[in-house]
Amino acid sequence: MTQKKNILFRVSGGRAFNKELGLGHVYRAINLALELKPTNIFFLVEDYGNVKSLLLNWGFKNIFLLKGGIKISSDITETTKLLYKKKIDILIVDKYDYNTKKYVKRMHKIVKTVVVPDLEKIDYDADLVVNGFIGFDNTILTNRYGAKCLLGPKYQILNKKYQNRKFTNQKKYTILATFGGFDEHNIVPVFCKQLTKYLDRITAKIILGPATKKSKELKNLEEKFRGKIKIISATKNMKKEIS
């Protein structure tokens, strides 16, 4: 009987101000982890708030936490301990800061390492780089360190629900507004204030994001315009919301 692989995701995310972080890295890791089952999945998370609860909600239980803003030396130490303790076969890194390249280089000496970066970043000393940045042509190449790179929208990591291209065409709301994982700049109240001017003609659904709290102001607004505006914290099926 073939033994299951042990895969560790190192991600960062949550309610982090002035870091442009949110939950994008976490959701991408979740989408990939769901496709990698029935392997043994572990998460090592630099949690700025709400990440652990989100992972638990998706059914993941092997979650280990790091403090937000952890120093690179401590990050490497804690990751290394976990690699050996859980006998990790593959490390998948989906985080971005100025220390990520140094972190990946160190980890690559210990374990097979995959990096999932953003924008035009590809030069990591790893085994595999997966970058679905829309600005890349779909291609496979080797970077300066000899790592295989899967580039372009073809390799974007999305929830498998998007593989079904059928749409329901049953629109309940005129407008659907989503603010990612975390509304760092508090745009939702401003948006809602303007939206109320047009609720005699439209209906709207707003998805705050798992790391954004539903304030008393928003609850009152939803109650005042019941049937015209619906505000939820999150969804597990964004395709269903937009189709």
Each model region followed by its residue ranges:
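A nucleotide-sugar donor-handling region in carbohydrate enzymes
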Residues: 125-186, 214-216
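Active-site and donor-binding regions of nucleotide-sugar-utilizing enzymes
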Residues: 9-20, 28-35, 46-60, 64-145, ...
